[in-house]
Structure formats: C-alpha cells, structure tokens
Amino acid sequence: MDHVNRQFHAPAPDRLWLSDFTYVATWAGFVYVAFVIDAYARRIVGWRASRTAHASFVLDALEQALHERRPLHRGGLIHHSDRGAQYVSIKYTERLAQAGVEPSVGSVGDSYDNALAETINGLYKAEVIHRRGPWRSFEAVEFATLEWVDWFNNRRLLEPIGNVPPAEAEAAYYASRQPSAMAA
C-alpha cells in the first residue's frame, strides 16, 4: 500500500524514509548502489554498494540507517520504496516490521511514485558517476560513493531545504526544539 501518495515531505526527521538503488557499469561488471534517504532534509541515512542486486544489499543499507538513526517513535516512521523484488522480499518486510517501521510501496513501473529517491539517484549519477567514470572496479565505485555521501550530507547545498546541506537543516530542526538557555 502507498502511504506517501507522492507527498515526499516530512514534518521532522525519521518520519519518512525513501529507498531505491541504481547501478554503475565498471570494467569488472555492474555495481549496485542502494540509498536510504530521510525525506525531511534529504539526508542519506544508509547506503550500500554490492556486486549483486540481491535483497541482502538493500537490507544492509536499511540496517545502516536503523543503526545510525535509531528511530524511537515506533509506528511513526514510514519506509517508502518502489515494488522492486528486493524491497518486497520477506526478509526486508520482516525487518521493517521488527523495527516498527511502516512499509509503503508505489505502483509498478511508475518512477514518480518514488520521485525523491529517483532524484537522489540522478544527482549521484550526475555528480560522481558520469563525471568521474569510466569505472575500473567495485572498490573504486564504493570509495567514490562513500566520499559523495559525506559531501552530499555535509556540504552540498539543496535549494528545497533553504540552500543548506542536509546535516545543517537537520541540526537546525533539533536546535529549534531545544528549550532556550536564555529562558531559564
């Protein structure tokens, strides 16, 4: 069921995560790269590169996001993806349930149903893959992805969130929720 209905906004961090993966051609074969994105500030909260497109690699990206973020409001986080076999697999959906995360999937063959995740994939391809290729190996893609995710989260300015990096937008959200030291 699609709980997002193309509304890729969240009132706070860890309320809506979006997932998708893309592939990169290398001289040694394809590399598959999965991302988990927090919709609030478009921050990449989990990612994984793999030599195969099995469900385990998207599950690894989800595990990274769950470990890093440790979402506390059980029942308040929606995880949205396309209907790819990896995301509707028993292992993946069971892990979402175990973590108290509500699954949401778009319709078959409609990239607009996961447009924000597709946009992040497009930025990744434009800003690192096409710019720095051709790629020789899995390791080269994995390392470049690690560098790009750090740059994207901490230094890339995003117009939809106020021309600040995702980490800064999130920090501003949490700072606005802290009781003012001056009020005491």
What name fits each language-model region?
Residues 1-184:
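Charged DNA-binding/catalytic regions of mobile-element recombinases
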